[in-house]
Amino acid sequence: MIHGLHLTIAELAVVVGSIVLVLARWLPPATRGRAAAGASVVTLAGAAGTLPDPRWQILMVLVADLLIGAATGAAWLLGRRRARREDGPGEQRGGDLRGDGQSEQRGDGPGDLPGDLRGDLRGDGQSEQRGDGSGGRGTRRRDGRGVRARWWVALPGSLLCAALVLGGGVAAWALPVPTFPEPSGPSPVGTTVLQWTDQSRDEPATRDDADRRTVVVQLWYPAQGAGAERAQYLGRTRREADVVAGAVAGYLGAPGFLLDGPTRAYTHAVTGAAPAEGRFPVVIFSPGLGGVRTQNTAWAEDLVSRGYVVAGVDHPYDSAAVVLDDGRTVKTRIAATGDRAEGERLRTAWTAVRAADLRFVLTQLGRLDSGEIAGPFAGRLDTARAAATGHSIGGAAAMQAAADDSRFTAAINMDGGLNPGQGPLRQPVLALTHEVRDKADAEFVTKVDTVLGAGGATSYRLSVPGSAHLTFTDAPLYLPPVPALVGSLGGSGSVRMTEATTAAFLDATLSGRAVDLRAKLAEYGTLSVHDH
């Protein structure tokens, strides 16, 4: 992938070659044929390099090429037909009357080549005119491609093809296949996906009394060595990634193909790699409403490289789509009601469900560490040093889980709204909030400060200039760089900010490393500290 352009070399060849093909119609006759021929070779070679699975943006460009090819072929055929008509049957009869069986040929070129092709071959770019006394009036000039349409006929087609080529190129840049930044720590990263059922809880989203709450968890962990095959993003397989991306797009009201890029991405983790020796602090992550367990993969992998285990949680019937071990896909049942009071009630209810999910996952990680659940993680997971973390409603759920369960020794809220009425927090908290731009943002920050101020440990709120709600996720790596959508920090800048601030906080609170936390956080924005 070419940095900055978000195109592979093959894709760039398709786009550049197609631009030249569009422009070739308007070049001087002496260069038109050579430019079109060269561009055709480049485009075909690039197209072959995108097979067998070209991105939809490149398909747009190739449609333009097909239109150009069809128009060129039609012009050539029309030129041949016109040449035959202008040769006329009379000359054939003249040859027959001479008795030599030969038909008379016009011009100086071979066979029935259009006159201006002969001109092009001579290099003078001139079209040969038939001597019928018309002076060419009412005719179209013909070149080496046959009949050349008048400019006002060709212009709309050229503009359409140009729009397809440029539109495809811009779309490929704006909606790229994400490239994940290299983790900053020394440890290789492994990953695996687990599914657990909490037999003590009913599934609140169904009416089946026998249905129990099930969660899907992706673990990222320090591994013994780097592997050759990197893990698929958004799912265990490409098919699962396609399902999840389509569901996320549908939840946002967008067509699924717009999120084609993330389904093609691979991360730095290696699926099933052997865990490294040692015991590592645990970080449990809850995604945003309609989000999925992998939405903060870049952040998770960076923390793991620094010596943490991260567990990303899918919440069935809340996450956009959760693919279960039996192949079933559970999609979200949460939708906007238009009623503010009802919306707040649902938000509170699902925050509680998510908080219970996080507590259950912490319990299961403890069972993995003890060997009660068989697997390679026995003795690796230090659940006595555990942080509840999340984004958006996941951040609120993390705060609720920490308030409800003292086993969590720290908490991180990434731009999640908090209810001042929730229970007090006894753990240190880091709250990352987007830039304050209006009254609603100011009210949002005030509620967060109220909760942090009521806690029992020193907590921090960092307002990050240039950030938006999705800045704290992987979204800046694959969504258009629209500040209102993903902020203005850039893809890698957004990821590095989230990694640096949260890692400093976890180093200070879970790992006991010497960190000037206040100074480190203040590097990235406006810091408010709630001392206790």
Question: Which residues are covered by each model-predicted region?
Answer:
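Short substrate-entry loop that stabilizes the transition state in hydrolases
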Residues: 264-280, 285-323, 438-441
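Active-site-adjacent alpha-helix of alpha/beta-hydrolase-fold enzymes
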Residues: 433-495
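Domain-level recognition of soluble alpha/beta enzyme cores
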Residues: 170-283, 491, 502-504
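Active-site machinery of serine-nucleophile hydrolases
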Residues: 222-224, 233-258, 294-340, 465
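Alpha/beta-hydrolase active-site loop
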Residues: 317, 323-380
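Primarily recognizes the serine-hydrolase "nucleophile elbow" in alpha/beta-hydrolase
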Residues: 361-425
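Internal/C-terminal transmembrane anchor helices
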Residues: 143-176
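Membrane-embedded alpha-helical segments of integral membrane proteins
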Residues: 5-10, 31-82
